[in-house]
Amino acid sequence: MALNLQDKQAIVAEVSEVAKGALSAVVADSRGVTVDKMTELRKAGREAGVYMRVVRNTLLRRAVEGTPFECLKDAFVGPTLIAYSMEHPGAAARLFKEFAKANAKFEVKAAAFEGELIPASQIDRLATLPTYEEAIARLMATMKEASAGKLVRTLAAVRDAKEAA
């Protein structure tokens, strides 16, 4: 379907606005994936706070200008599906990684986080980032473990002091 100039400008404005508020972006090639599977992916994306859109490469290049995702420009080749993580930096990467496991034809091209290009081979770096809740839980576990260790060492020191006296 041919797009007129106003439609193209609207697409660029929409994607650019989303890019400015996004935490990370992942680019993939969805050629060969069935419509049903793509619908499932889009639904999972909405639930995970991921904005997904298939956009023409020239429009996408214009949309990412001046954003931290400008480093992805070289990945805009062939059919391009872009996903922006809006709530958690690893959400889109995690979603695409899981989807690629189940669908051999789905290929992750690259990702970007804080202006750094992450090649597809290293997508796990972004996908394994803990969520906010997971990070807080790990921190609390570490703090709790450290205080318990201090208590044990203190009690051992008191016991040793009593035995020495």
Curated annotation (Swiss-Prot):
It comes from the Bacteria. One of its GO terms (molecular function) is large ribosomal subunit rRNA binding. One of its GO terms (cellular component) is cytoplasm. InterPro entries: Ribosomal_uL10 (IPR001790), Ribosomal_uL10-like_sf (IPR043141), Ribosomal_uL10_bac (IPR022973), Ribosomal_uL10_bac_type (IPR047865), Ribosomal_uL10_CS_bac (IPR002363). The keyword Ribonucleoprotein applies. The modification N6-acetyllysine is found at residues 37, 105. It holds the Pfam family Ribosomal_L10. One of its GO terms (biological process) is cytoplasmic translation. Keywords: Acetylation, Repressor, Ribonucleoprotein, Ribosomal protein, RNA-binding, rRNA-binding, Translation regulation. Forms part of the ribosomal stalk, playing a central role in the interaction of the ribosome with GTP-bound translation factors. PANTHER family: 39S RIBOSOMAL PROTEIN L10, MITOCHONDRIAL. NCBIfam families: PRK00099.1-1. Ribosomal protein L8 appears to be an aggregate of ribosomal proteins L7/L12 and L10. Part of the ribosomal stalk of the 50S ribosomal subunit. The N-terminus interacts with L11 and the large rRNA to form the base of the stalk. The C-terminus forms an elongated spine to which 2 L12 dimers bind in a sequential fashion forming a pentameric L10(L12)(L12)2 complex. Two L12 dimers associate with a copy of L10 to form a very strong complex (called L8). Belongs to the universal ribosomal protein uL10 family. This is Large ribosomal subunit protein uL10. It comes from Escherichia coli (strain K12). The gene is rplJ.
